[in-house]
Amino acid sequence: MKNLTLVPLGGLCNRLRALLSARSLVDHGHELRVRVVWDVNRDCAARYDELFEDHFTPTGQFVFSKSRWLDAPAVWRHNLRLPALFRSFVYSVQRADFHSDWAAVECLAHFEKWRRVYISTGLQLCQTPPEVWRGLRPVSPLRERIDALCQRMGAHTVGVHIRRTDNIKSQSVSSPQAFEREMRAAIAANPAVCFYLATDDSALRDHFVQCFPGRVVYQAGDPTRATREGMEAAVVDLFVLSRTQRLIGSYWSSFTDTAAELGGIPLTIARG
């Protein structure tokens, strides 16, 4: 594989999984050139460079590109899968929703016989080492917001991420009552504990602030992720959660998993 066009799909953290794993491929494939099509849409309402500093393109092997019709994932109800048909004249192979747990060298070997590869996915292409995640750096204004929130946290802070709204799988396993039990257990274990709470449900956020007076730090504002401002807030929440001592998170949530992986912190999934 000499040239890879990667179309990261889904929300912020799904896209980061795909993107950073592609970065891992570059570390092991020195002739590989990666073109990333980061489309701004209802799943992710901001460009990568509006959220993070670019530590990819200085390598000379990464290019972020605007989306073209030919780059669109093949979805019958949207485009009758026509882009995939036309891509077959341009690319050696196409993979939709590709995912592997291979090491980077194994993934490169899998695609070795194809010169031009197209992948659209919200999953990792290969294993991503912790140091690649640690290289992810929010833009300066967001770092300032992250630091300000971290300064408000106590020495014993547990992160809490509650995913509600459109994630039915998460709601079916990680109920508000399950989070409350985990938080009360944390207080019983350490009466000095406080919490950083990130959630997409403002009513639930207010409920927990009342349940645990003086213990809950959170980012003020509308928790929607449908705007650029909302995506900026998501990055802030993600990095603040990653700086807590441990995380109580939601089942089937890439945001929960990414926060824990980013910080290298223990993760407990609220269940029940």
For the regions a language model picked out, list residue spans one by one.
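Active-site regions of enzymes building and remodeling cell-envelope glycoconjugates
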Residues: 49-54, 212-219, 265-267
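Histidine-anchored nucleotide/phosphate-binding helix
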Residues: 15-29, 179-187
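Secretory-pathway luminal glycosyltransferase catalytic domains
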Residues: 45-189
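Short, solvent-exposed loop/turn segments at secondary-structure junctions
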Residues: 11, 38-43, 124, 163-167, ...
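Short hydrophobic beta-strand segments
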Residues: 1-9, 33-35, 116-126, 155-164, ...
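A donor-sugar binding/catalytic signature common to diverse glycosyltransferases
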Residues: 10-11, 16, 20, 234-272
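A short, glycine/small-residue-rich beta-strand->loop->alpha-helix junction that serves as a flexible
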Residues: 8-17, 167-173
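Catalytic donor nucleotide-activated moiety binding site of glycosyltransferases and closely related
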Residues: 161-165, 184-228
